[in-house]
């Protein structure tokens, strides 16, 4: 999808405020929902994915199962709200041995397991909104001893709220981020005593 696109800086694949946030995504829902709601903490539209079973309610990009993203930027960043329920996401990458590998992170696992085509790992989320930064270059090298070439697919499962999902060429400090990539929390007016 993005193979022939010049890639530098930031490349967003989901923005909850956009007119069609799931334009390039496919949805699967069983015993749950995927809908856009206003989150009270940030007073803004977000995408909520909820389901009784994490494996049967998810969004996947690209929508066409025969297509791949072709994103070469090595950092995946997701702005996600912890709903204090089971949550998992998966990223499929291509390495320099021309092997498709999957990384699956979830908040209900306690150990990392590396198998030839999939690496599953635990993920700890703080209360409220989190910025998940995933260094695909480093994970591919550490898990498989190979070099990351590109990201083929991203799949985000229940249960979470999503503000944005993007790729970047490096990790950026809060000051360096473009305004629309920051998560603004409303300023609390504290009464003077």
UniProtKB/Swiss-Prot annotation:
Molecular function GO labels: RNA binding
Chief location category: nucleus
A Pfam family it matches: CFA20_dom
GO cellular component, as recorded: axonemal B tubule inner sheath; axonemal microtubule; centriole; ciliary basal body; cilium; extracellular exosome; motile cilium; nucleoplasm
Gene Ontology biological process terms, A to Z: cilium assembly; flagellated sperm motility; positive regulation of cell motility; positive regulation of feeding behavior; protein polyglutamylation; regulation of cilium beat frequency involved in ciliary motility
InterPro entries referenced in this protein's UniProt entry, alphabetically: CFA20/CFAP20DC (IPR040441), CFA20_dom (IPR007714)
Keyword Cytoplasm: yes
Keyword match Glycosyltransferase: no
Subcellular location(s) per record: Nucleus; Cytoplasm, Cytoskeleton, Microtubule organizing center, Centrosome, Centriole; Cytoplasm, Cytoskeleton, Cilium basal body; Cytoplasm, Cytoskeleton, Cilium axoneme
Swiss-Prot/TrEMBL keywords: Cell projection, Cilium, Cytoplasm, Cytoskeleton, Flagellum, Microtubule, Nucleus
Similarity annotation: Belongs to the CFAP20 family.
Function summary: Cilium- and flagellum-specific protein that plays a role in axonemal structure organization and motility. Microtubule inner protein (MIP) part of the dynein-decorated doublet microtubules (DMTs) in cilia axoneme, which is required for motile cilia beating. Involved in the regulation of the size and morphology of cilia. Required for axonemal microtubules polyglutamylation.
Subunit note: Microtubule inner protein component of sperm flagellar doublet microtubules.
Name of the protein in question: Cilia- and flagella-associated protein 20
Organism: Homo sapiens (Human)
Lineage of the species this protein comes from: Eukaryota, Metazoa, Chordata, Craniata, Vertebrata
Record gene name: CFAP20
